[in-house]
Structures are given as C-alpha cells and as structure tokens.
Amino acid sequence: MNVKVIRMNTGEEVIVTLLNETEENLEIENPLVGMPTQSGQIGFGPWAPLVKNDESITISRSYVVYIADAQVDVVEQYEKIFSPIETPSKKLIL
C-alpha cells in the first residue's frame, strides 16, 4: 500500500492509499480522516462515506495543500483496517 497523508485546503488531514498522481489530479482509495479523541489519541472516520466501497476517488490538486508520508504507527493501523489479511504485531515473544 502507498499510504499518504493529504492535507486539504479545508484543513482536513486525510489518510489514503495513493494510486496515481498527475500534475492536475490525485487518484486515491480508502480515504480516512483523522479525528482527535477525548483520550488524546487519534481515531479514524470515513472521509467520503457515501462513495461506493473499493471505488477510487479523483481529487483535483487545487484542493491539496500538501502530501506526506504517514507515521509508521498510522500506516500500521490503516493497513489493519483495510488489509484482508490479519497481520500479527511486531512485538517479540519472550
């Protein structure tokens, strides 16, 4: 997965799988928006809840402030949500 954080000009930070990018557009899938919780952590919610599942979305670059790599723990959580395969945690067993 090519997991990225996209900052929209509306202020939202959207975690996505980036499929393709051109000078004018980005093609993404599985967009989630990060939302702070009362416990100080970040939760995820759907960014485009009315879009058909597993369908890509095209976004104009004119709405994008920046694109960046997501933090490792964010990528791991994102992949757990969208991966059809359950992956074990990377902790050592003693």
Where are these regions (language model features)?
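Conserved RNA-binding domains used in RNP assembly and mRNA/RNA metabolism
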Residues: 1-94
